[in-house]
Amino acid sequence: MLYENIKKLVEYGIQTGLTPECEKIYTTNLLLELFQEDSYEDVEIDSSSIELEAVLEGLLDEAVKRGIIEDSIGFRDLFDTKIMNCLVPRPAQVQKTFAEKYEESPEAATEYFYKLSQDSNYIRRYRVKKDMKWKVDSPYGKIDITINLSKPEKDPKAIAAARNAKNTAYPKCLLCMENEGYAGRLDHPARENHRIIPIEIAGGKWGFQYSPYVYLSLIHI
């Protein structure tokens, strides 16, 4: 199953445009290294309908089985982010593509970046679908009510491990530029698959990014 899921994930990367076809072998080898696997067999897969959630679930179960990670949501989220980073273009390439798309139109650039943020699993679409949203009337007009279920609660193992972890002030905050590519900790989300677009506003240097939790449609920071 490991070889099958690795091949499916690489194919997912190619289909979504995260991974160029010419990097298929390179990406496969990156994934094999994560699983401490020295060999590989090119197995047959059905590439017509690859479900990212199912593929990642299978890979995470394999990582638990091999003793690479503990079986808790905290460790699984850290590791599947590391897995996805094997598919995602480096920041310079993302910035270059964004700039090229911007020459076409700002809409083309932001649509590209939002799609990448979803395809890379930075925005976890299968969790966002679980969010509950509805509208209610009020004296001031309609109010949007949202119950965010896409941000998972920490399990007891993660809480205990975080309590014993070494304190650090890096990154400075959850939205700071230092998060791009950060491996994460049990008390700080992994952002290895995260990309930020540098922009200049009124002479100041800023970073454009989307929220991974989609409190509102296309919410960005």
Predicted feature descriptions by range:
Residues 1-175:
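Extreme N-terminal flexible tails
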Residues 113-126, 174-207:
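Extended, Lys/Arg-enriched charged tracts that mediate electrostatic binding to polyanionic substrates
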Residues 139-140, 201-204, 215-216:
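Short, well-ordered loop/turn elements at secondary-structure boundaries
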Residues 144, 207-209:
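Structured core elements
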Residues 149-151, 210-214:
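Short, flexible loop/turn elements at secondary-structure junctions
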Residues 219-221:
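Conserved small/polar residues in nucleotide/adenosyl-binding loops
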